Amino acid sequence: MLRYIISFFILINVISVFSQEEKDSIFKSTYGMKIGIDLSKQIRMLTEPDYKGIVVIGDYRLLDKLFLAFEMGTEEKFIENEVLSFNTKGSFIKIGANYNVFNNFENLENEIYVGFRVSSSKFDHQLNSFTIYSKDQYWNQNKIENTEFFKDLSATWFELIFGFNAEVFNNTYMGLSLRLKRLLSQKEPTNFRNLYVPGFNKVLENNKVGVGLTYTVQFQIPIYKKKKIKI
């Protein structure tokens, strides 16, 4: 009888230890929405007097490693060189997702991710002047100063993104991302080209590819917590 009692207590102790280990291997991970701004636009305004812009960014944690993401903003850029002078002003929106490839330890919510954005922009150009060049160096170049407006222009493009977000304080994140952009379509004005697209940046002739960097700060709004197995 004593043997059965001892065996019973040993079994209870083993189950208790196993349950405690299982409990210790589980922690709660925060699910919520992050909202913030792209600081690279503010930095750019300090270094480029002819540029104005602001971008609001956000994401929502849908699954353990999957985040739905959005960006929206406005930009205004004045460009003047030896050939022409023009202004571009418009707004844009980007929608996509990020996938976190980083396995966090307990109480860490950092991200190293790959993602994509499908982007669209609406904008206007104001052509201030342009120069007609002549191969004959004996005559001055013909500069035409005639303001002309090109309205209701548009462009769409795709972005492939590599980046990270680090939780520097509780629910406060700093991030960096590299963007590879591919222009998909655009509505161009008559007798002019889209040399600058808000949200995409400069558009080069016969080249629909662009590159960009973002520096972000975001604040998380916790919605709920979900159990996760400790690594």
PLM region spans:
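Short glycine/proline- and aromatic-enriched beta-strand/turn motifs that initiate or cap beta-hairpins
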Residues: 19-61, 218-229
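Short loop/turn motifs that connect adjacent beta-strands in outer-membrane beta-barrel proteins
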Residues: 20-31, 65, 103-111, 168-174, ...
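Residues that define the transmembrane beta-barrel architecture of outer-membrane proteins
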Residues: 31, 50-54, 89-93, 110, ...
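Transmembrane beta-strands of outer-membrane beta-barrel proteins
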Residues: 33-37, 68-70, 93-95, 110-116, ...
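Transmembrane beta-strands of outer-membrane beta-barrel pores
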Residues: 39-43, 72-78, 99-101, 118-124, ...
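Extracellular/periplasm-exposed beta-strand and loop segments of Gram-negative cell-envelope proteins
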Residues: 45, 73, 77-90, 123-134, ...
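Glycine- and aromatic-enriched membrane insertion/assembly motifs of diderm outer-membrane
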Residues: 46-103
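Outer-membrane beta-barrel "beta-signal"
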Residues: 94, 98, 208-231
